[in-house]
């Protein structure tokens, strides 16, 4: 089992020449490779895409075997991938998924980091995060709009909709957290983001998600103060330990205007630098003494949350951004760790009730012009949504593509299938140079059960019911998605979530039209269904307006 190979440099093919037998298998092949592009993945030589140890394949041998299988699949074959390893090719039918993926799933009694790590070390499992092991990660852009929407809503609720002259404090500039600085600036606020790895800071600078950096807190605060005074948003990366910096801000009596965190706290061994440790010591002991790392990290997380709770008590709008930091602190003895809310119940759930979530698409041509044309098509088909148009304009201006050109765009039930059909028509007519794939984050309205994040504080108490993502995966499979994934532990770690993903190819065919209409209606409709079942009036109204047939819910 080879987990590290510094000689491997993977990039997706572009253009219209196929390596596989059809676009329906070429697409997952290119997206797997795109996940490991050096401009996309955090540690591609280790197959790590983002989120601590979120991998695209179990090991390099499995990666090569997946590639070989995808290149030989026929139009009625389905490849099965078990925790990053290809385990079977079966004859199904042309409208079945070409790939079915299950990552990190454990029987609940054994669904914890200790058991998973034991399996992982034996080469029997792989942590797929959400979009790492499901081959639809698009770099930091994948979360930037959701983060932007959250910050805009924080501004609306706490500062009358105006974040000019305000600043956000946060931690973590990895594959997910790296979206925060740009999202804050796009929302009108400055951002001070603490990151312990210089390489992560450098990647955000290189890809345009971060404006500048320093290793001096004094310099960072000076830059933030100047930007706020001038009301010109600026993002500053600070090399350091976020828990240490928060303690220092409290000592100095300095209060940010907004506070959150996106370190990889979900993984106490691989995701969080303990206070007082160097990165080099941490990296060495993650392998040689993982229990020591975990204990030290949990102590630091407790301190981190205590500082956030202090700011919260002082009136600073404080929110958990879904990394399970509060849970880790609770287990370390901070009994009131959940005194401040998670971002979904506080700011995002009304969108989920209407099936609105992180719709994304990728141009397999590799040509950015294909994304520009699809951006224009979105505006044409959704002409009256000024907020969406503003997002698309900002994205075109400020977001650098990582790997294959892509776009994230939060739209919901009734719009997703229209966009999919329009994109397919553009491929068919030759307006787009090659097919596009349409997917989403597993963080969506009907595809995840995560009591400390997406399903926190559900109205009916059904936070932990995980039937919903299972039904979502089954329905997307039946509807004809090109590949479907079912994962455990993404975002918040082992034992705390189950979630499903889907990707579908617009190859220009009439058969694709039928699949797109089914999948891109049914997928967001499960989110409306799930929230209607939980008693949300917004969701029941949406379900009635869209004519959903929900016999046990709408009576």
Curated annotation (Swiss-Prot):
Gene3D superfamilies given in the database record = Urocanase like domains, Urocanase superfamily
Which keywords does this chain's UniProt record carry?
A: Cytoplasm, Histidine metabolism, Lyase, NAD
Q: Which PROSITE patterns match?
A: UROCANASE
Q: Which reaction does it catalyse?
A: 4-imidazolone-5-propanoate = trans-urocanate + H2O
Ranges that cross the membrane? none
Where is this protein found?
Cytoplasm
What remark does the entry make about the cofactor? Binds 1 NAD(+) per subunit.
Q: Which cofactor does it need?
A: NAD(+)
Where NAD(+) binds, per the record, is at 51-52, 129, 175-177, 195, 262-266, 272-273, 321, 491
The top EC class, named as a word, is lyase
Report the superkingdom from the record. Answer: Bacteria
Molecular function GO terms recorded: urocanate hydratase activity
Cross-referenced InterPro entries: Urocanase (IPR055351), Urocanase-like (IPR023637), Urocanase_C (IPR035401), Urocanase_central_sf (IPR038364), Urocanase_CS (IPR023636), Urocanase_N (IPR035400), Urocanase_Rossmann-like (IPR035085), Urocanase_sf (IPR036190)
According to its UniProt record, which residues of this chain constitute the active site?
409
- Please state the Enzyme Commission number of this protein: 4.2.1.49
Its UniProt pathway annotation is: Amino-acid degradation; L-histidine degradation into L-glutamate; N-formimidoyl-L-glutamate from L-histidine: step 2/3
NCBIfam families from the UniProt entry: hutU, PRK05414.1
Instruction: Check the record and name the PANTHER family matching this protein.
Output: UROCANATE HYDRATASE (PTHR12216:SF4)
Functionally, this protein is described as follows:
Catalyzes the conversion of urocanate to 4-imidazolone-5-propionate.
Family label: Belongs to the urocanase family.
> What protein name applies here?
Urocanate hydratase
| Gene name in the database record | hutU
């Amino acid at each position: 089992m080879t987990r590290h190979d510094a000689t491997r440099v993977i990039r997706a093919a572009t253009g219209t020449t196929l390596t596989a037998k059809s676009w329906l298998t070429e697409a997952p092949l290119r997206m797997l490779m795109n996940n490991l592009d050096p401009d996309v993945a955090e540690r591609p030589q280790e197959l790590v895409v983002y989120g601590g140890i979120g991998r695209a394949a179990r090991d390099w041998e499995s990666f090569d075997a997946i590639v070989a299988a995808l290149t030989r699949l026929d139009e009625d074959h389905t490849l099965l991938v078990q925790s990053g390893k290809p385990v079977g090719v079966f004859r199904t039918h042309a409208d079945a998924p070409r790939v079915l993926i299950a990552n990190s799933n454990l029987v609940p009694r054994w669904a914890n980091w200790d058991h998973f790590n034991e399996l992982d070390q034996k080469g029997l499992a792989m942590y797929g995060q959400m979009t790492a092991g499901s081959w639809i990660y698009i770099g930091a852009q994948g979360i930037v709009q959701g983060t932007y929407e959250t910050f805009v809503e924080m501004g609306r609720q706490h500062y009358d909709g105006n974040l000019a002259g305000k600043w956000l404090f946060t931690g973590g500039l990895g594959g997910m957290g790296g979206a925060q600085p740009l999202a804050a600036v796009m929302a009108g606020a400055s951002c001070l983001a603490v990151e312990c790895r210089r390489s992560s800071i450098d990647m955000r600078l290189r890809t345009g998600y971060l404006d500048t950096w320093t290793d001096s807190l004094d310099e960072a605060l000076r830059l933030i103060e100047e930007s706020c005074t001038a009301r010109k948003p600026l993002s500053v990366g600070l090399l350091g330990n976020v828990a240490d910096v928060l303690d220092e801000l409290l000592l100095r009596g300095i209060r940010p205007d907004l506070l959150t965190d996106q370190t990889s706290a979900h993984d106490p061994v691989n995701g969080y630098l303990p206070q007082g440790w160097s990165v080099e010591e941490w990296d060495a002991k993650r392998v040689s003494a993982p229990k020591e790392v975990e204990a030290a990290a949990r102590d630091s997380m407790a301190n981190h949350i205590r500082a956030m709770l202090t700011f919260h008590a002082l009136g600073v709008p404080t929110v958990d951004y879904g990394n399970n930091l509060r849970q880790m602190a609770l287990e370390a003895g901070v009994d009131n760790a959940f005194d401040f809310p998670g971002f979904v119940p506080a700011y995002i759930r009304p969108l989920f009730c209407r099936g609105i979530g992180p719709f994304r698409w990728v141009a397999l041509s590799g040509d950015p012009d294909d994304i520009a044309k699809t951006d224009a098509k979105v505006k044409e088909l959704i002409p009256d949504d000024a907020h969406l148009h503003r997002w698309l304009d900002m994205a075109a201006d400020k977001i650098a593509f990582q790997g294959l050109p892509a776009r994230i765009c939060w739209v919901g039930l009734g719009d997703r299938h229209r966009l999919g059909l329009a994109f397919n028509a553009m491929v068919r007519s030759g307006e787009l140079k090659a097919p596009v794939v349409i997917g989403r984050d597993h963080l969506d309205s009907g595809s995840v059960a995560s009591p400390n994040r997406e399903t926190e504080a559900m109205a009916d108490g059904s936070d932990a019911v995980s039937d919903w993502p299972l039904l979502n995966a089954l329905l997307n499979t039946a509807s004809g998605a090109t590949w479907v994934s079912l994962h455990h532990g993404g975002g918040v770690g082992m034992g705390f979530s189950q979630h499903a993903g889907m990707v579908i190819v617009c190859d220009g065919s009439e058969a694709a039209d039928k699949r797109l209409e089914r999948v891109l209606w049914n997928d967001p409709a499960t989110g409306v269904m799930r929230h209607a079942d939980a008693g949300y009036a917004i969701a029941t109204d949406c379900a009635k307006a869209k004519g959903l047939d929900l016999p046990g819910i709408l009576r």
